[in-house]
Amino acid sequence: MLQPAHVGHLPILRSLIRDGASRGSFDRELATDSREAALFFSNLRQALNTGYFVEEDPRTGDLTTVAVPGYVYLPDVGGGANKPIGFGLFKAIDLGFELWLTGVDAEWRGHGHGRAMLAALLATPPGKRAYIVRVHRFGSDSPAMAHLLTSFGYMLVHETRHHAVHLRTDAPPELGRRLREWIPKETTG
């Protein structure tokens, strides 16, 4: 079952994101107490309060606000039904949404919760228009996520140094044509 994410969910989101970062599924910096991680989680708090995240536009360098609807996942069965065990955050793009961040608590993996949560996320209004998913290429859970995305109609269309970019097969043709300009440039190092 999904519930809209709110600022009260920040502790569980922070925990799941830090765990995912330590496994290589998200930027590893997010697993640290760095200035960048503090800024990210401050922006995430704002997004959970307002629905918007502040970030730098990769094309112009300007700061911009981006719609970031999100959900937490509670299992329909089991002892953890009273607390979220997973989450999904979408980020608005020019033509729809990117499934931006998603994860399931490690203790609950391997029991179908990732598939159930992804199905529920993709049935939400932003999920129905979530045409892009970027997956860290070398995370310990990346192969499982890539397999899961394939089963939901996504295909690998581009790889950067750090990410595999998956595009849903029913994405607007214009999005596929503009994909390279939309993908943020990755710095070396």
Language-model features, listed with the residues they occupy:
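Extreme N-terminal starter segment of soluble prokaryotic enzymes
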Residues: M1-L2
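Conserved acetyl-CoA-binding loop-helix of GNAT-fold acetyltransferases
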Residues: V104, G110-A123, H147, S151
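Short acidic/glycine-enriched loop/turn segments that link adjacent beta-strands
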Residues: L95, D141-S142, H162-V165
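C-terminal "cap" of GNAT-fold acetyltransferases
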Residues: F152-G189
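Conserved beta-strand-loop-alpha-helix junction that forms the acyl-donor binding cleft
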Residues: R109, I132-A146
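Glycine-centered loop/turn motif at secondary-structure junctions
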Residues: R129, T150-G153
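Acetyl-CoA-dependent GNAT
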Residues: V7-G8, S15-W100, D105, L118, ...
